[in-house]
Amino acid sequence: MKCLKTLLVSTTLLGAFSLNAEVTLEQQIKITDEGLHFDGRNLDFSNVGSPDTGEKYDYFFGPNISAHGDAVKTYKHYVFMTWYKGGKNERNVMLSRYNTLSGELSTIEFPHRHTGFRGDPLVGESHNTIGLAVSPINGTIHMVFDMHAYDDNNHGGKFKDDFFRYSYSVPGAAELPHSEFTLDKFVKDTSEVSQGDDDYKHLTMTGDLGDKGNFARLTYPKFFTTVDGTLLLYMRLGGNNNGAYVFNRYDAEAEKWSTFTPFNENNQKSKGNPYNWGLYGNMKYINGKLRVGFQQRSSDNTDKYKYQNGVFYAYSDHPDGFGDWKNHKGEPMTWPLINSDEIKVFEPGDYISHTEANSVYIVGSFDWTVTEKGDIHIISKVRSTDRNRPDYEEVYIHSYKPAGADEFIISTDFTGASEIYTSGDNVYIVGLEGGRPYVEKAQGGTNNFVRVYKATDGPVFDHGTLYIKDGKVYYYLMERTSGNAMPLYLQIIDLDLESDANAPLVSFPSPSLTVEQGFEKLSLNISAESPVEGRFIQSVSLYINDELVRTDDSMPYLFGHGSKPHETGAMGWLDTHEPNPSPLPAGTHIFKAVAVDSEGDSAIATMVLNVNSNAPIVSFPQESLEVDEGFEKLSLNISAESAVEGRSIESVSLYINGELVRTDTSLPYLFGHASKPHETGAMGWLDTHSTNPSPLTAGTYEFTAVAIDSEGEESTASMQLVVKGEPQPPAVTWPNSTVTVYEGYEKLAITIDAESPVEGRDIQSVTLYRNGELVRVDTRPVWNFGHSFAPYEFGAMGWLDRHEPNPSPLGVGTHTFTAVAKDSTGLEGESDMTLIVLSLPGPSITINESDVSLLTEYQNLAITADASTANDDITIVSLALYLNEQLVREIYEPPFEWGGENYSDELLDLPVGTHLAKVVATDSNNNQTEASMFVTIELLGDLNKDSVVDNKDIRLFTAALRNGEEMNIRYDFNDDGVVNNRDTRGLVHRCTYSRCGSN
């Protein structure tokens, strides 16, 4: 089935649907050549910290930010459009106004630039769209822009006092002349949190900073205008699986917005709901009412849905939505909503066969609308989560409830669409095929789409967004070129509603009927007439489920009359009628009447016929059941009865995973009773029961009951049994179980490995705790913490220029980090890592000389040292030399040398003895380290080391010479270059006592 990227739209046709309207392109206008577009890589958390720093503009989520979101609106004969300015270094918020009468284009450039993903301007953020509105009461322009659930504290406080961005103009600015349509018509922020003299962004819409908490953590702005001209704004509060829709109101007379009011509560679990949930859909003001339609994303990760499930719809009978909310049946709901089941319409996940956890995926291609006469249309898509599985399934669904009908018609005969807009009674699909616009239309309350327009030339477009007003489509488009600045266009497409007014008026007696299977009679008198004088109805054709029944060319247009009893699916009611061999079976059937007038114009009406089944009604005690592996007892009392008086139940058969267990032919239809304990997979529970040799093991089982009545008609019911085995939680692994760093460390980024040991289970989240306190929950692999957008998670200081120093770094000590992984069944596994933070060591110091031994009267002594620090951010302040704890000299820069040039005598004249030389190094953290050596000074001539020079030393001297021993050159007293007997006299002259000399 070919799938097109489409939009679904509706507009008025005065009660009839014409197939002959001439939809035309009325105008095409180039708005700019410089619309911002993200042309780089689609990043994730594993690489978002290293975006392209060149020309390419990398992005997170999606590449579109201009001609995206709530970006085009009309006011009188003007069309207003918002966009961001390309390229990468521009990014300004822009507002353009096109005058459809004069062709004049005016553009205002705002100082604010797109801040990028979580505050990084190098990474584009497609969710940060610009919402736009013009008050029809006072001509003020309102813009809310460039935000994604920001508050004062998240993302390192980057958005403090700037997490909500609202700009507005003075009254009447919307229709000022071209020369006066300028930036100064917008109101500056002069509050205490103003970002400067050119700040046109306001932190609240009320003007009161005391309300700022009401404007935090919001995303996706969209404005609406009520029937009396009041502006409403709705946004999403919170996150994907715990969020709420909130809305506020503009009082044009007071020129003031209210605070936001919730449609539903978030944190629903704390208010009694079994789980938290978020909304994926829209709030819209359509047909005079505020309405909501969405799919639910719950925090329950054990069901078969990967993300969203269900279709939910509600509307308010209050003119501004402040109360009186109801479901599609008109039944009151709790407001604010807590339990979403109060407004559930149906479950798209039932339209594919998968039942395993997280196997069903219904993200995207969802939207809804309501026509002017009250037809509700909802589109959705469901597919297998795993696109590679051999039994892959994908279904597009168009569910619609014609005005006056009680229930929805669910059709899978639908090619798909992405968004819906409404204005009247027709449904339109507007989209791009081959990059060029096309339009298809169907009458509201039907699924009969016909293509009525296709562009064949002109620019090829990449994407667009649209707004419909008074029968015209304002299609705001980005041309498909290249780079991060691409052209933007406005196309105005006329839907030709005037010709639709000439279409015939055709209707069934009722929009819906309900009959019992085997109904005898259904006669339908179809009303058809032309609203144009002089025209007449040429024919009326009846179709059932899109198959032609008959064409009638004369009044009355009666189908199913006495001569043709079977044509409406009835059995026949007269004695002359043979039983219908092909009566309409149980189910929902669409009757369609096509009226054609004398000018060839045609119109369609539809009716829903519900045929109630005569088959037995059969059910299990409950739809699903969980037991532990090895369960002893499972008794199932299956209910079965006939819907038709006089019939009886002949048998009920039980199947497990398609295999017959047993057929029971008498009440009660009880399986797994005491006489047959094993047939439902149980072990047995009485002393008389032997152990089941083939019990049901861990897994999911489909139980099916087939009931057959006395006429041979059968019905089935099913129950899912989950047999739980021993828990197999995810395995969590750190790269290293212990990491050691020094105090003040700049960077610590760690990727955690988490996987389930069970095939088919996915890791839904990894949560990091530091010393028992929550750090962050990551819901998208790779499970990377401490990356450049979260540099402080492991207590580091930060390492990029844009990182402010961590105000709370981890101190010296041992810290425990715990990673908790949760899988798609809700099981959790965890693992710890120990982080040891050491004090920064003092400097390393080395004295280059070993211990020194010298003789008195030595002429030189030098000591040198080298020192280094623990890291490059620390410097050496000084090295100081101490001799015997007395400072010699402190040196503040290398070379570190004492006794060298310019200081040659500072180490001379040391007395006899051993001296401690100590060098103390001091670094810029005031840490000190020391190294030491010994300097020994001996008395010259005291060869026997008795502290005097005497005859004993002279004898030792002469004996050494006789023995040829090498002597210190200092004993060359006569300076002839050798030490010999001639130096004995010199030694004698050094005798301590004069007597030695005379001797």
UniProtKB/Swiss-Prot annotation:
Domain of life: Bacteria
Record: active site: H127 (proton donor/acceptor)
EC number, as in UniProt: 4.2.2.-
Pfam families: BNR_4 (PF15892)
Keywords, ordered alphabetically: Calcium, Lyase, Metal-binding, Signal
InterPro entries: Dockerin_dom_sf, Ig-like_fold
Signal sequence region: 1-21
List of residues binding substrate: S126, H127, Y280, R297, Y361
Membership in a protein family: Belongs to the polysaccharide lyase 24 family.
The protein, known as: Ulvan lyase, long isoform
Organism ancestry: Bacteria, Pseudomonadati, Pseudomonadota, Gammaproteobacteria, Alteromonadales
Recorded name of the encoding gene: ullA
